[in-house]
Amino acid sequence: MIKTDQYVEHIKQHAVRFANTADLEPLIKAAANAKYVLLGEASHGTSEFYTTRAEITKKLIEEHGFSFVAVEGDWPACFEANRYIKGNAPEYSNAAEALHSFHRWPAWMWANEEVTRLVEWLRAFNRNQNKQVGFYGMDVYSLWESMEAVVQYLEKINSPAVDKAKKAFECFEPFHRQPEQYGISAAFYGESCMSEVMDLLETIQQNRKTYDNNPESSLNMQVNALVASNAEAYYHAMVTNGNESWNIRDRHMVEALDYIGTYYGPESKGVIWEHNTHIGDARATDMAQEGMVNVGQLTREKYGQDQVYAIGFGTHRGTVIAAGKWGEAMEVMPVPKAMPGSWEDVVHQAGEFNKYMMFTPENQELFQETIGHRAIGVVYHPEMERFGNYVPSRLSERYDAFIHIDETSALSPYVF
């Protein structure tokens, strides 16, 4: 049982108050030693989580040589932003136009004013750089868009693999871009396209060297083929096994990250933007008992604990962009004061101001008890949150550091 008063005292001793990016310098320096810095968020609709991550990202790129940003977004739409950032997209006159490539719900996660400002900054930064900083999506959802991109690229270079790509694409055509329909058919009626997408991915990987006239176009095609293969598996599993589909998704994100890291070279470093539920080590939560893994765990296992620096984010209260049901219109919702005895509550009790904590060997054991830690998704019911929005977590094992913003406000999305 958590002794709240004791926890509050520990936080007072080890937390550092901050008001601006300059105050975060010790945290940024500590994070910069890693190959990958994972920046979380407690919701997908909080302005301050985006703006704080953007400021940390700029510092890591400008002062510590980080090579790219990879986010919890679709690869094809993010690649349009990447093209704009690198000056390769004359059809977009500004970042907002490039971000209108995000069509899939919830588009607000990336088509918003906060991301626009970061994308414009990255473009301006790249103007004076030989090695261009990139912006990529790690998610698995873009099955049809990724298949289209593969077919178009193989047609453009007259590759003999185009027939396999078209065959795979045609296999998905009867499902009218409805992934749930495909998942049901694959799971219950044996109407799977797995062999077609696996065959295509294998062919593309075997012929990788023949696509290298334009290395980034080759990367784009290879990751789109990877998305198609893993999305097929994801939607297949989603219907029958939610935990397994989660694992397929997070393993895909780490695979995509590996492709990007290989493209930028062995010395490259990346900044990753994802929800806390992805970047905070699953082994330090109740996910582990469910047999679930996530990006935080998988990257630590793959690259080593010292090469991954995960920063969780949280708030005591505020407003947020979310929806009442999957696919419904977004709205501004209240974020109630944190539940008594939760992590966000005790951090707030330690001082009603913004603060950060770094978990080190000296203080780690003070924060190893299990405590409820708020997680808000794209679907949110504030009045019900005490029943399902607090993840039992051992904070100092889940993250390397934590940023608490006491009162937060809703993101500024584009409506289109």
Residue ranges of each PLM-predicted region?
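Structured catalytic-domain cores with a bias toward divalent-metal coordination
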Residues: 1-416
